UniProtKB/Swiss-Prot annotation:
Keywords: Hydrolase
EC numbers, comma separated: 3.6.1.-
Entries under PANTHER family matching the protein: ADP-RIBOSE PYROPHOSPHATASE, DIHYDRONEOPTERIN TRIPHOSPHATE DIPHOSPHATASE
Biased composition (Pro residues): 220-229
Gene this chain is encoded by: rppH
Organism name: Acidovorax ebreus (strain TPSY) (Diaphorobacter sp. (strain TPSY))
Protein's UniProt name: RNA pyrophosphohydrolase
Residue intervals of the Nudix hydrolase domain: 6-149
Keyword Ribosomal protein in record: no
InterPro entries: Nudix_hydrolase, NUDIX_hydrolase-like_dom_sf, NUDIX_hydrolase_CS, NUDIX_hydrolase_dom, RppH
Record has Ribonucleoprotein as a keyword: no
CDD domains in alphabetical order: NUDIX_Ap4A_hydrolase_plant_like
Job description of the protein: Accelerates the degradation of transcripts by removing pyrophosphate from the 5'-end of triphosphorylated RNA, leading to a more labile monophosphorylated state that can stimulate subsequent ribonuclease cleavage.
Length: 229
């Protein structure tokens, strides 16, 4: 279902834990990390689609989250031709999205990447709120920045300022090869003897899963699964 401009209606989900970190998933059998998202089916409202995608991709049910906010308008991004199925080229242009900010009310072990027979992710982790802007595939970076910026006003004030602190430290973080991020992940996530949720595995530093530096992100390997959701 496309609009007259070739954009597919879609929802994006920013899921927060109690530390105001965001859920970050690795697309199955690829090196690509992203927020949960998915298309709006005919007859669905954006909120209905959001709850469906939340269960399909993360395994959560409506009582396990609290809806904090959503973006006011559609946010659009265009998908490069190399990521579009050949039979859709020429009329499919990209996604237009309503983004939701959710608070997890349960626990990490409530997340289940195998809630359906068609999983979207094969690994996940919690990231600081602004980290996805550093590592998401380039053609999504603009819409991620718009969504994160619009919804950041619902975070505690110090979390909003962290965006600018990260911007100033970005060069030094890359020069240190992600060691600070790895240490932060180890201290917050992978506790000794911790039992992972069903279908979950942790990549301690998804920034280092990308085989190219940040400036070379457009040359990321093409996912085997066409990016049409």
């Amino acid at each position: 279902m496309l609009d007259r401009d070739g954009f597919r209606p879609n929802v994006g989900i920013i899921l927060l834990n109690q530390r105001n970190q965001v859920f970050w998933g690795k697309r199955i059998r690829t090196h690509s990390w992203q927020f949960p998202q998915g298309g709006i089916d005919r007859g669905e409202t954006p909120e209905q689609a959001m709850f469906r995608e939340l269960h399909e991709e993360v395994g959560l049910l409506p009582p396990q989250v609290r809806v904090i906010a959503r973006t006011r308008d559609w946010l659009r991004y265009e998908v490069p031709d190399r990521f579009i199925r050949r039979d859709a080229r020429g009329h499919y242009k990209g996604q237009k999205q309503i983004w939701y900010l959710l608070q997890l009310l349960g626990h990490d072990w409530d997340l289940n990447l195998r809630a359906t027979n068609h999983p979207e992710f094969d690994a996940w982790r919690w990231n600081d709120y602004w980290v996805p802007l550093d590592v998401v595939v380039e053609f999504k970076r603009g819409v991620y920045e718009m969504a994160l910026t619009e919804l950041a006003r619902f975070l505690p004030r110090h979390e909003q300022r962290n965006r600018y602190l990260r911007s100033g430290m970005r060069t030094r973080e890359h020069e240190s090869s992600g060691q600070a991020s790895l240490a932060r992940t180890s201290s917050l996530l992978v506790k000794p003897g911790m039992e992972l949720p069903p279908g979950a595995s942790f990549d301690p530093d998804p920034q280092n899963s990308v085989p190219a530096p940040l400036e070379a992100l457009p040359t990321l390997p093409v996912p085997k699964k066409p990016l049409d959701a």
